[in-house]
């Protein structure tokens, strides 16, 4: 926004209290928020969630020079599926794992950060880009920004708002429209501290063999 002077609109799907998160984003500089919320959307997996958010973005409108930005993955499900699925449903090109973005007209040059290096690719707008956290340092909240946030527009989209969109059908949204659902989740037990063996090579080898034998591993 600082470099290009563009308008930033934040979308989120969740219960009504998610408005607070959008207001926080507006206090950090976002120009407008869109809250997608309805009981019909509850229980959605990544497929159904992307279906709903894609319909909301399409209803709001996608312009020729728009860039849709998403995080690499959510911190709860950790699937990294929603961003790419939205791109597919909106028939937009997509780039994942973006660590640097440069814009020249309607062309973006994006540096993708991979496990074993990086890849530089170009894409035309409109497009979807999922970003790693190192891409940018978020602004800090300020008192002035917090007051200003409540004067900025916040749009609420419900099932009634979106029900006529081709992507929205009760068979493809919510729990009923989710191909997957979580049966249970748990926090794994903490592991104890590792054991350090000191000494020369033969000495530590003998100690390790003794420990493994005592545990009936060898």
Where are the language model's segments positioned?
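N-terminal glycine-rich FAD/FM-binding segment characteristic of electron-transfer flavoproteins
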Residues: 1-218
């Amino acid at each position: 926004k600082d470099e290009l002077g563009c308008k930033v609109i934040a979308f989120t799907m969740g219960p009504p209290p998610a408005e607070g998160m959008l207001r926080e984003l507006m206090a950090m500089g976002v120009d407008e928020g869109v809250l997608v919320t309805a009981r019909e959307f509850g229980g959605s997996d990544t497929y159904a969630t992307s279906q709903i958010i894609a319909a909301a973005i399409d209803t709001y409108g996608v312009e020729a020079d728009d860039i849709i930005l998403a995080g690499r993955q959510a911190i709860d499900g950790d699937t990294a599926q929603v961003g790419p699925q939205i791109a597919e449903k909106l028939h937009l090109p997509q780039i994942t794992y973006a660590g640097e973005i440069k814009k020249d007209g309607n062309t973006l040059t994006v540096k993708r950060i991979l496990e074993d290096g990086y890849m530089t690719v170009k894409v035309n707008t409109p497009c979807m880009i999922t970003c790693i956290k190192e891409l940018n340092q978020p602004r800090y909240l300020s008192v002035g920004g917090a007051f200003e946030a409540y004067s900025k527009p916040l749009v609420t989209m419900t099932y009634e708002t979106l029900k006529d969109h081709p992507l929205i059908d009760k068979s493809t949204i919510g729990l009923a429209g989710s191909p997957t659902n979580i049966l249970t989740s748990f926090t794994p037990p903490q592991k104890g501290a590792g054991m350090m063996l000191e000494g020369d090579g033969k000495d530590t080898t003998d100690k390790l063999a003794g420990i493994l034998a005592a545990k009936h591993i060898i």
